[in-house]
UniProtKB/Swiss-Prot annotation:
The keyword DNA-binding applies. The gene is HOXD1. The keyword tRNA processing does not apply. GO terms for cellular component: nucleus. This is Homeobox protein Hox-D1. SUPFAM superfamilies: Homeodomain-like. Keywords: Developmental protein, DNA-binding, Homeobox, Nucleus, Transcription, Transcription regulation. Its main location: nucleus. Residues 1-60 bind DNA. It is found in: Nucleus.
Length: 67
């Protein structure tokens, strides 16, 4: 079974980015709180953070390429 891709609103993205800026990892309790406040499922917030960490890692690799 697959799930449909989530389209986040501008407000949701802004809040998720703010949260990510504060901490790259969320505790389960905080994740549930964020999900509830943004009207998202816990799993959507979890996956967004996983993807955002990978995006950050990629940006850092591009900025500092291996010699």
């Amino acid at each position: 079974a697959f799930s449909l891709r989530t389209s986040f609103s501008t407000r949701q993205l802004t809040e998720l980015e703010k949260e990510f800026h504060f901490s790259r990892y969320l505790s389960r309790a905080r994740r549930l709180e964020v999900a509830r406040s943004l009207r998202l499922r816990d799993a959507q917030v979890k996956v967004w953070f996983q993807n955002r960490r990978m995006k950050q890692k990629k940006r850092e690799r591009e900025r500092w390429p291996d010699p």
